[in-house]
Amino acid sequence: MGYPHLHQAVYSITKSVLEQLEIDDIEELKKNYNGYGSFNLPHFINFNEKIFSERIYLEEFAENVRKGERAGIGRALLSHGTIKDRTSRGKSQYSGSIFHTGHLLGFMLIGNLSGFNSRKTNIENVVPLTPWANGNGFKLNTDYGNSQRVYEQLIKNCITKASNQSETDFRVYYQVEAIYDNESEDVPRGILLQAVSNNKKYLRDIHVFIPNVKYGMNSSIDYTDWKLNK
């Protein structure tokens, strides 16, 4: 258990990252630290929060958009019909490195969607993430911190709750973006995770930045190449 405290959570932050998060400076970002390793951002960023009013009859889907040769963005429309009761199978570690095979769109949220490659070998959907950023927790604000896994579980739980209460049309528009400092780095500085639902009774808006960092005595990471981090 554990999570990066503020001084460790900002380790990955550069001027370029701040610009992509639409934050003026590091001190402003620090004000958005949620106390559990990640940052609750003040608004959506490059995200269609009006999708449910603009595209009423949109069907469930999942897609990836690359950033050059790297995994970039995952987008999906989620419902009870897309979620799965387990996580994906396959290799969980970048061999010989500190990194997990992190994903943009997690199997537990889109595992029942046919036509989408959710395997850990899909380079458009897999990025190197630290064990903390990838996450082990299941609830917000615990000793595990607020990692990507925690937000995925939160969304899944809300979809399940809505379904149990016969809200069969409950939908969540979900977007996950790997934020890099520059085009030459292949390890993301963090994950920008955003979600909006068609019923705020079950799920409120989410716009959070999860830094791809370590915590503890040795927090250094070389973001140029995952192979340099053993």
Segments predicted by a language model, with ranges:
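Long, non-catalytic terminal segments
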Residues: 1-53
